[in-house]
Amino acid sequence: VNDASDIDADRRHHRKRSRPFASGALSPLVGLPFSALLAIGGLALGAVLGPLPFVAVAVYLVMNAFYTFWLKTKQIADVFALTGLYIIRVVLGGLATGFLASSWLLAFCGFFFFSLALAKRVTEVDTAAAGGGVGLSRRGYRPTDGPVLKMMGVASGFMSCLVLALYIQNDVT
């Protein structure tokens, strides 16, 4: 659904133009109904696994839609949303396998995924800055945002390492 909402911009992007919707390999008339079926299937599987997995899948789908249609144009909020979506995947994996994610894992993932999401934005900002700022307006960033995003990403990456180090040194774990 996110790729379908970005189809015109993706067609103009040097790397994203090869995505199925943007390249024309998959029609949105086929892909969007199929994604609806997958969402329904995910909810059904979540319901089979129990109320908590069902709620987690539902929250993921709602948050994904919120990101697709609004948050991805908001500075920094988009990065927090991506981080949240990644963390929900970890939680769902734990629920599906019967191994609940520990607070250590969730803290590590929060900082690590935040760093990765920032790296994604830094790449987009730097690429756009090299091309005169083309393509940034739909994301809410400016070419001058790169240094701040980089500092935040590095700090978050260090925090994930700190959480991992504290976990390793903890006598209880």
Identify the meaning behind each predicted range:
Residues 1-5, 51-67:
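Membrane-embedded alpha-helical segments that form the functional core of polytopic membrane enzymes
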Residues 7, 12-57, 103-114, 150-163:
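Multi-pass membrane catalytic core of lipid/isoprenoid biosynthesis enzymes
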Residues 10-14, 35, 72, 86, ...:
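Short, function-defining helix-loop hinge/capping sites that tune catalysis or transport
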Residues 35-43, 60-65, 85-89:
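Hydrophobic, membrane-inserted alpha-helices
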Residues 69, 80, 87-173:
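C-terminal membrane-associated helical module and adjoining short loops/tails
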